[in-house]
Design a protein with these regions (language model features):
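Alpha-helical transmembrane-bundle signature of multi-pass membrane transport and export proteins
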Residues: 1-419
Length: 419
């Protein structure tokens, strides 16, 4: 089949466009919230509460979200959560326009975090119903690529709109929130056009046993457990993005404009990788490809840690984004293909919990190590940042070796297209 055969699937194409529109709006909202909170409070702690306000509902709602995704129409869950996201976004619009107290912003973010927690497992588990198994890996590649594209376009569009609106409007963030609300409504309209439906064979009662079925399945399936563990620890140890402001100002001397480019470099690399993957045959040794991609991620992270040249640093982060995209495609494909449909929602919820918390904790870990080996020990802050990034890259490589030895099934896994 051709590289773009999956796009001839009407339902998948509608799903893909809806995902891009929704992701674009969410990326814009994330930037706008950070900008408005800092403008109003000038507090780094206020920015820290943004992640916390979305992480708390994710941890609290993960198990119920997985159970709901396995026992109710996944399409309807996506539609309902899109409406909730739209309402929360319009709530932020009002709060920003009237300059309401900051805690109201956090309340809306808690609602958004809860809606996303229910949306993710339903959306992930719904995708296998839209395409045949032979095209699923390509579908995941396109889905990942559109998300990364929104990660590049969203902040850029948001920044440009805020810069323009700031000259003529006292509440530019309100416009961004309204646009995200419209994007969520557009996603609702697009998903409602999808003809295929997830049919629940038999609803399972809400119980501790059924809620924990996703965790039990993950820990019983060695390949899924190994892939989730690999990605979780790699993100926890190898993430350099939280320290990019230090690199841009103290090490590379590139300032705010350079910081913007550095933040865009990983999504750019991921999009480029997605384009390459769509034009080549499916991975023949998916397990080995994932292990090697994470190992290269660690090596590129180490090299970035030592780099003092801006464009070399940009290129190394782009490499990180590219190989991370390979890992994401393989992991997501394995999780969905190896999980029975009646458990896909709960397993997807567990997957999102591990990855989501590792993203948040990874930033905290990087900052803690940088502070410990920087100012706490009397060294420049740049020294602490370099030690944090390089040690994280080394830790990532050690994780790859450990996973390959503990779960040899991953090394032996072949094609993702079911052939």
């Amino acid at each position: 089949m051709g590289s773009y055969a999956v796009l001839r699937n009407r339902d998948f194409l509608v799903y893909l466009i809806g995902r891009f529109v929704a992701s674009l709006g969410q990326q814009m909202l994330s930037v706008a919230v950070d900008w408005e909170l800092y403008e109003r409070t000038h507090s780094a702690l206020a920015l820290g509460f943004v992640g916390l306000s979305q992480m708390i509902p994710m941890v609290a709602c993960t198990l119920p979200a997985g159970h709901v995704a396995d026992n109710f129409s996944r399409k309807r869950i996506i539609l309902m959560m899109s409406l909730v996201l739209a309402l929360a976004s319009f709530g932020l619009t009002f709060i920003s326009a009237v300059n309401a107290p900051v805690p109201w912003i956090y309340l809306c973010l808690v609602v958004i975090g809860a809606a996303r927690t229910f949306l993710w497992p339903a959306s992930s588990a719904f995708l296998p119903h839209l395409v045949p198994r032979s095209l699923f890996a390509r579908a995941v590649t396109f889905s990942s690529g559109t998300f990364q594209l929104s990660s590049v376009a969203g902040p850029a569009v948001c920044g440009a709109l805020i810069a323009i609106m700031s000259r003529h409007h006292s509440h530019p963030a309100a416009l961004i929130y309204a646009l995200n609300g419209i994007a969520s409504l557009a996603c609702f309209g697009l998903v409602s056009l999808i003809r295929r439906e997830h049919i629940v064979a038999a609803k399972q009662p809400l119980s501790v046993t059924n809620l924990g079925a996703g965790f039990r399945f993950v820990f019983e399936n060695k390949i899924i457990l190994g892939t989730i563990t690999l990605d979780m620890l790699a993100v926890l140890l190898g993430g350099a993005t939280s320290l990019l402001p230090i690199y841009a100002k103290e090490i590379l001397g590139s300032g705010a404009s350079g910081l913007g480019l550095l933040r865009a470099s990983m999504p750019i690399g991921a999009v480029a990788c997605a384009l390459v993957l769509t034009h080549r045959r499916p991975l023949q040794k998916a397990g080995r490809a994932m292990l090697w991609s994470v190992a290269v991620f660690g090596l590129a992270t180490i090299a970035f840690g030592f780099s003092k040249w801006f464009w070399l640093s940009f290129a190394l982060l782009a490499v990180c984004g590219a190989v991370d995209n390979i890992s994401v495609v393989v992991r997501h494909s394995l999780v969905q293909l190896l999980t029975p449909d009646e458990k896909r929602g709960r397993v997807s919820a567990v997957n999102s919990l591990f990855i989501g918390t590792s993203n948040e904790l990874g930033g905290a870990e990087s900052g803690f190590v940088a502070q410990l080996f920087g100012r706490t020990m009397g060294n420049p802050v740049s020294t602490g940042a370099v030690i944090s990034v390089v040690s994280g890259g080394i830790g990532t490589i050690l994780v790859v070796i450990a996973v390959a030895l503990i779960w040899p099934q991953i090394r032996k896994y072949g094609r993702l297209d079911g052939a």
